[in-house]
Amino acid sequence: MAESLGIGMIGSGFMGLSYSQCVVAHVEGAHLVSITGGSRAGALAEEHGVPADESVEAMVARPEIDAVIVATPDQCRLEITEKVAAAGKHLLVEKPMATTVAEATRML
């Protein structure tokens, strides 16, 4: 059997909730590893039985995380995306990807 893809969730608002529920219920071959970001991260992590990381840095340091979903407010995504990419993790960034074309270009 192939290994399951470990997913980290950054963001605990409506879209963080939606994406995490989708990963848990509908993404075959993937599992939620941890959640960080936002005032509801702890509650959302508890709901899914995963840890709530204290920071993006703590999350991306986890070797069991292969990919990260970024579901944060638009203005936060550039810095987060750069940290996740620097850690060598795959990314799914919510739309709009960035607030400017220059930021989006940096993210690529």
Residue ranges and their predicted role:
Residues 1-47:
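N-terminal Rossmann-like dinucleotide-binding module
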Residues 48-108:
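Beta-loop-alpha module in the N-terminal Rossmann-like domain of NAD(P)-dependent dehydrogenases
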